[in-house]
């Protein structure tokens, strides 16, 4: 523990937050992470509107975050790849990264739990997994996540409680493994799971609090376009994998 009573191990883990058109929830998220004990927080502006610039300025000036920026919106997949490359080149001594959403859905204590799991199991992909049976989960989120989870399980033979979680922890070795993964937007995270399965990388789940603010209205997941992208990943996997055929 540090002198302030915060876990000293958190200084070895970088938190990465991709953000598009943020509001004050980004500031609240960063402040809570600072209070939890994280010292290195990296925020990427993925081509946000000009009027959100003051939020990013405050994240840097008031919270001491490092800022990266895409001049145009490239999507979450590209944001993650940009961050992985930056971290690998800039922080070669770090233990790894925990990715966090900018909309306030991930509690600092759960981010810390994923960081601890990352340090304890550096060869594993760490997933912070929500419980969709809890009350307060929007119906569309409950249905969509259950369906995606079942399709993923059928195709890959791998049970993952929360395939779409943005709270993930990975070591430098895993960042390097995931850099070539295809996908520019939310489908990239699904491809990460498939890549982990292909490489026989362990996936460890950390139960986290299920938080939906204003029924998830601030999410940038497009129910139509991003769902098509995610299920296109499944279609490609179906065509290329003999494991599925063997189970039919």
PLM regions: where:
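Acceptor/aglycone-binding surface of glycosyltransferases and processive sugar-polymer synthases
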Residues: 66, 72-74, 78-87, 108-186, ...
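A conserved acidic beta->alpha catalytic loop
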Residues: 45-54, 104
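Hydrophobic helical membrane-anchoring modules
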Residues: 1-10, 31, 181-248
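Short loop->beta transition adjacent to catalytic acidic/histidine clusters or analogous donor-positioning motifs
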Residues: 10-14, 34-43, 65, 95
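Short, well-formed alpha-helical segments that are part of the catalytic scaffolds
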Residues: 21-35
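Acidic helix N-cap motif at the loop->helix transition within catalytic regions
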Residues: 25-28, 50-59
């Amino acid at each position: 523990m540090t002198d302030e009573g915060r876990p000293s191990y958190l200084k070895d883990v970088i938190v990465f937050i991709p953000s598009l058109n943020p509001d004050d929830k980004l500031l609240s998220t960063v402040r809570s992470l600072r209070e939890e004990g994280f010292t290195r927080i990296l925020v990427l502006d993925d081509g946000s509107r000009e009027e959100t610039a003051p939020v990013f300025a405050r994240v840097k000036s008031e919270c001491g975050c490092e800022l990266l920026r895409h001049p145009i919106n490239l999507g979450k997949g590209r944001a993650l790849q940009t961050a992985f490359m930056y971290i690998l080149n800039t922080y070669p001594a770090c233990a790894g990264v925990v990715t966090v959403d900018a909309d306030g859905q991930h509690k600092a204590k759960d981010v810390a739990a994923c960081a601890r799991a990352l340090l304890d199991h550096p060869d594993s992909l760490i997933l912070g997994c929500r419980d969709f049976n809890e009350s307060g989960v929007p119906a569309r989120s409950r249905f969509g996540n259950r369906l995606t989870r079942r399709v993923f399980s059928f195709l890959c033979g791998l049970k993952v409680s929360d395939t779409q979680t943005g709270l993930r922890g990975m070591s430098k070795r895993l960042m390097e493994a995931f850099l070539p993964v295809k996908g520019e937007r939310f489908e990239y995270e699904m491809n990460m799971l498939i890549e982990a399965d292909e490489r026989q990388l362990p996936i460890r789940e950390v139960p986290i609090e299920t938080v939906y603010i204003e029924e998830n209205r601030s999410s940038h997941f497009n129910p139509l376009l991003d769902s098509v992208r995610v299920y296109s990943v499944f279609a490609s996997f179906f065509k290329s994998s003999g494991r599925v055929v063997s189970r039919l």
